[in-house]
Amino acid sequence: NQSGIARGLYGMETLNRIHQKMAKALGEQGGRIDAIFFCPHGPDDGCHCRKPKPGLLHEISERLKVGLAGVPVVGDSLSDLECADATGALPVLVKTGKGPRTWPKLEAAQAQGSLLQTLVFDDLAAFTESLLRGDLESAITTARGHVSAD
């Protein structure tokens, strides 16, 4: 969600510069970004792509011709996790950005029986390391409530 565009806080040029900076930093570490998807709408625009609605993930799935079942979707907000869960993807919370504020909300949701398969990592680097080591599979199969996989 990039509602700052709809609210006039910044424009596409600024967002593009942010994306370019992110891609450059990742490229310097040997990584790459193949595509960036985002919702530019505000909370009251009634679009299908604003999280927690799953429209954006469905669009990604269609464009890339891949299924979403079990695909890790990493985020720092409850709406990120709910969006992933709504598509059958694997919700992954990182405890950076909004993550520390989201953690108690996740625990409350799990107490109500939702988002039980959510994995939790300290940061994106910890998630990436686990993914590259192949450790996610064991974390997924043992997930009961939240799993701190860091």
Predicted regions and their residues:
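Asp-based, Mg2+/Mn2+-dependent phosphohydrolase catalytic module
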Residues: 12-35, 42-73, 77-150
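Short linear capping/connector segments at secondary-structure termini
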Residues: 1-5, 38-43
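A short secondary-structure junction motif
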Residues: 2-15
